[in-house]
Amino acid sequence: MNRFHISGPKNLSGEIKISGSKNAALPILLTSLLISEPIKLKNVPKLTDIMYAIKILTKLGVKIKVEKKVLYIDAKTIAICTIPDYLTKKTRASIWILGPLLARFGQAKISLPGGCKIGKRKIDLHLSGLKKLGANIAIKNNYIIGSVITKLIGNTIVLPIASVGATITIMSAATIATGITIINNAAREPEIIDVANFLNKLGAKIIGAGSKNIFITGVLKLHGGSYTIMPDRIETGTFLVAAAISNGSIICHNTKPNVLINLTKKLCETGAQIKTGTNWISLNMKGIYSKAINIKTAPYPGFPTDMQAIFSLLNLVSHGNSIVTETIFENRFSYVSELKKMGAKAQIKNNSLFCYGVKKLYSATVFASDLRSCASLILAGCIADGTTIVKNIHYIKRGYERFQEKLQSIGAKICN
């Protein structure tokens, strides 16, 4: 059934092992097309978006073996360079296959990508970046059709906005292009560093990932090897907030505290007690009535847009009023009307959410409309009085591995 029945309120406390990062695993998996030798990817989360990416690669002729959290990939031989819409419409990440196909094979035909419906999320920057590397690209009958006469050629590309997706597309395509490519105003997200580390381990020459300027010296080819995907910082943040909203205490293991400073700093401002180690973060909110604080999403190292819906829930059940400003995507407050059904008090004005804290939420039947709103509504159900029904839970499986089981392990009462 595409719904959860959640009984609350429950105190969410315990220990969680964080899974591999969805936002790193997807581009790394798809850029494996650049490599003709066998690859071993470890710590790959079991998610529907990963499954769709595997189906796309398999359709192209890539051989993939799955063993728990490990993928064995052999892209030595590609049968076709065309991806039909029934595959690309399932995940927006499918756009990341365009660069590797053009760089290695000189041709590509993919249907326009799908994914969560959050704002416009244009692909213009991906296409313009590839054009500056020498690709010929046109859109016909809902398909992106690309070709390269000989090889992609390095160039200096200035991104008008620091797009994560476009940075990854250009960086991956440039690894086996001729000459040097410079990406100015590149996105700085940790997942971009992870993609660069993966490519560098297999022979790429990328310098500056994680800064505003990335330099890529094209190499003739990449070689095979093994790589471990970084932990998921958004999953970590989600479970930290889960404990915070329920006056709980949690330890998140197998994570990277240094890439979560933008979030943990804000959690401390709410009153949470945060401790960190080399690969763990703990939060204690027992006996503490959280304070509502203002947040504003921004490209990394700013506050992550993927945490906006989840942190807003904390504001809505905290003491005082606050303003949440969304600067990355349009239409990312779809969850607010659903939380209002549960007793939340909020008002949307343009790209800002005005939160008026309440002490308690109440059960209701609510509908998720994207991945992060689904997580927010599920967490709301965990602390609401009564039994909440969250529908459209298929979204949660796109970005959280074993979310139901992990929540149950820290005290949530959830069933289908």
Swiss-Prot record:
InterPro entries: Enolpyruvate_Tfrase_dom, Enolpyruvate_Tfrase_sf, MurA_subfamily, RNA3'P_cycl/enolpyr_Trfase_a/b, UDP_GlcNAc_COvinyl_MurA. Pathway: Cell wall biogenesis; peptidoglycan biosynthesis. One of its GO terms (cellular component) is cytoplasm. Its EC number is 2.5.1.7. GO terms for molecular function: UDP-N-acetylglucosamine 1-carboxyvinyltransferase activity. It is found in: Cytoplasm. The keyword Cytoplasm applies. Belongs to the EPSP synthase family. MurA subfamily. This is UDP-N-acetylglucosamine 1-carboxyvinyltransferase. The lineage of its organism: Bacteria, Pseudomonadati, Pseudomonadota, Gammaproteobacteria, Enterobacterales. The gene is murA.
